[in-house]
Amino acid sequence: MALLTAATRLLGAKNSSCLVLAARHASASSTNLKDVLSNLIPKEQARIKTFKQQHGKTVVGQITVDMMYGGMRGMKGLVYETSVLDPDEGIRFRGYSIPECQKMLPKAKGGEEPLPEGLFWLLVTGQMPTEEQVSWLSREWAKRAALPSHVVTMLDNFPTNLHPMSQLSAAITALNSESNFARAYAEGMNRAKYWELIYEDCMDLIAKLPCVAAKIYRNLYREGSSIGAIDSRLDWSHNFTNMLGYTDPQFTELMRLYLTIHSDHEGGNVSAHTSHLVGSALSDPYLSFAAAMNGLAGPLHGLANQEVLVWLTQLQKEVGKDVSDEKLRDYIWNTLNSGRVVPGYGHAVLRKTDPRYSCQREFALKHLPKDPMFKLVAQLYKIVPNILLEQGKAKNPWPNVDAHSGVLLQYYGMTEMNYYTVLFGVSRALGVLAQLIWSRALGFPLERPKSMSTDGLMKFVDSK
């Protein structure tokens, strides 16, 4: 038990994480994120070195044949510092729950939702930032946001039938021309300095992503109209919504919430694991994140909210917009009895309602309580879990984040469902790139697990 507790400390539980304590003692007045990191990293390197010396041979868990054939589900095999997924409480960012982040992270003047800049600071340092630190990040990203001309030209020349995620991945890969890390590595550099150049690349990439994403949106859906210029007085999300062409302050608030809650979800999901794996080869952040986006583009990872909207639209066509609970129950049972699933319900890890769903529901109750699509989502929330429990197949009958996000985007006029995964990708950069900085700071090696063939596995089992 003591060893498990020690492992939990390493992974960042709020009440025991030395990293959080160190962060709170690290130049709390500094608004320069790199300076704060420079203070934190040697302490964390020493802490982990001692931990490995004392417990390096400790067995953390067992691996079963089912795990090997089942996508390594539940297998403990990664160290990922920025977030931990609790089956009952949901995601914790450096130990803080989503409700705690909503309450404690700085907000825009007159706003009610957390600023994603603040979450990035928290993910990188383990420390709740001040308003001044968040403002520094907003200005810093605004300074770094300009796109090189070759990337603009490439985006402008993509065919309109090229999927938005393909465009995003290609543009991020092309931004590799700007990599500080790749240049320094080619010239020969001390590995102790890796994290510093990775940090610079991650900051540049996060700054440029809204410009790339907005350009893709304008080219595909707004006849190639200009995204305009970055305003250094505005926060990251506000600049993003301006470049997309949306001026409703409520949509900007939604984007702040969306970009915050989709940012990170532990290290085992496809996009997070991909960036970690590719980064372990010392590929620069642009190449690592582009690979992550190719994983996110897969229908089993990043297309779930799109599938929810398609299903909701089909439901409305078949039973009408003002459907009774009884008719809705019949429709859901017909869906399940035909071998299909109710999209947006269930999760690989969670065993309660996804807190990311809950905070979006609260946003909708506040801003769009009479919207027909939201009312349908709320009605499903009341009915579906009980049916899934009655059916007896689902381990988790509760809604996840994807059951709600598309409805909110549709309400504010963003109806282009093929684009939704791009928004997800912009958000996910905050988490996986924060971790990438720490992966290089802590000297994580090339990832190289052992594989086995089915014949080899059978022989191994027979020998037991």
UniProtKB/Swiss-Prot annotation:
Catalytic residue list: 301, 347, 402
Pathway noted in the entry: Carbohydrate metabolism; tricarboxylic acid cycle; isocitrate from oxaloacetate: step 1/2
Record GO biological process: carbohydrate metabolic process; citrate metabolic process; tricarboxylic acid cycle
Keyword Transit peptide: yes
Gene Ontology CC terms, in alphabetical order: mitochondrial matrix; mitochondrion
Residues recorded with modification N6-succinyllysine: 57, 76, 103, 193, 321, 327, 375, 393, 450, 459
Localization: Mitochondrion matrix
Keywords: Acetylation, Methylation, Mitochondrion, Phosphoprotein, Transferase, Transit peptide, Tricarboxylic acid cycle, Ubl conjugation
GO molecular function: acyltransferase activity, acyl groups converted into alkyl on transfer; citrate (Si)-synthase activity; identical protein binding
Modified residues (N6-acetyllysine): 76, 321, 327, 375, 382, 393, 459
The protein, known as: Citrate synthase, mitochondrial
Gene transcribed to yield this protein: Cs
